[in-house]
Amino acid sequence: MRVRLELRDLPRFSLFPGQIVCVQGQNPSGHCLVARRVVAAAPPPMPTSPVSSPAFGALSMAIASGPFTCAGDLAYEPFDAMLAHCASTRPDVVVLLGPFVDAEHKTIRGEDDSHPLEASFEEVFAFGVRDRLEKFLDASADAGYAPSVVLMPSTRDATHDAVFPQPPLLADGSVEAPAGVVVACAPNPGTFTVNGVRVMACTQDVLRHLSAAEAARDAAPGGDRMARLVAHIPGQRSAYPLYPPARDACVDAALATHLTVDVTPDVMLLPSDLNPFAKIVPREAAHAAAANAPPLAGEDASAEDAFVAVNPGRLARGNVGGTLARVYVTEGAPEPGKGGKQPHVIAKRARVDIVRV
């Protein structure tokens, strides 16, 4: 039976199509449910590790999201600038999020008559991304620096399947790396562990899609809309909780099980066309925003029950360079006197810089 949902008595809510909610209220007329309380989140637990785990050690990451070249050419100058930044600052991990060969680039689309494309999409990826990355890794090895690299595709990648969720971009060994250097190719969305720290990434612009579809009311002044949108992902236990999906999302519902979020990550990477940001997000933020409950601000949340969300922005924006993100995690001391597994408390130990290239 379908009935209309009346939200006038709720001071705060955040709802969108496809969201799974529990509504408490009354239906006196039989055709309108007057909500008194809405529970819209059941986030999974935060990760924990033994006190001897490397998750309590220091860590640095550089994160960039495509496009990796400017709109007017295929010179990949912003990518060169990013690799130069990494060579000088030496992050432990370099995370590269697609698109690498942007299907929306006018040259790739065949719309640039002055510079027609004379190479295949695979050749563009080879000279624009793979060769540069291999040269960077070889030079780094010669200098005694061995970063790990993670690559994740986008539905806008002209060299890959335009379906979401996506398999990894390359097969293992496609990027020739020096001995001891790890180059991992992750699916989209994907979760990977770096020195014990759990990182989740998704190159689908889920924040922009949720922002366009959300209906919300927030009676509290200064509410953080971006943190609220981010919290819907663990709250709904899905990397893409919106249904029906946005028209450009390329979602294959038959593969929905690959969107499941079974653990709230320490760090969540959500590249978007929206403004770059870094936020501490309480795990229960989506519940507080949707229910008749007091607001939760990042500063007030327990660091043990919060995660770090990062939108690094786009490495290239139009004809100019864009931004990348640097994540620094300081060494942490497990709580004395407690054995077994403990939370990583990354939200308390992390600093994020948005760097312009």
Put a short name on every predicted segment.
Residues M1-V357:
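Extended recognition/assembly regions associated with phosphoester-bond processing machinery
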